[in-house]
């Protein structure tokens, strides 16, 4: 899949306008520029960034409940998936509040630079996830961050009681779910990733500690 095709796929997956793609192209240009001096993403993925990073992140959008008011992306890195979702949200859900949590100050500086360039209103917190306790999210997202068990630990202090977790996972997802169920009770569903043959979008709801 070429990057050109991936741009069209992104427009189709999220039914976004050319204006949103233009904002993402500004993001892509800054990513390429910054990545030459700061390791934001693997240099091997830059030539396929629209598929490997932008489309991969954007595929979460259709899974976000329409009534969502607050979305928190944990371990945002260079903005995948949270910054991509926030850019889509500018068009699709302008009243939704996005918060991105990332402990690396350089990556946060990059995300703030992107946000300024495209006039994106997003909260970026430079802290470890477990240090953030003063926000509550309807939806928590994460991409390539940790095991399901660890993601639930990260989420427990910031997810609302009726909240939803959306995680991009790889081929170890089923094994991770079995381990997570030793400590947690939840409902889960998986949707095939559109960017990785062995990947999925994992949706968790009704999350509680196992008694």
Where would I find each of the regions flagged by the language model?
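Active-site capping/gating segments
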Residues: 172-211
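Class I SAM-dependent transferase core
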Residues: 1-68, 72, 105-118
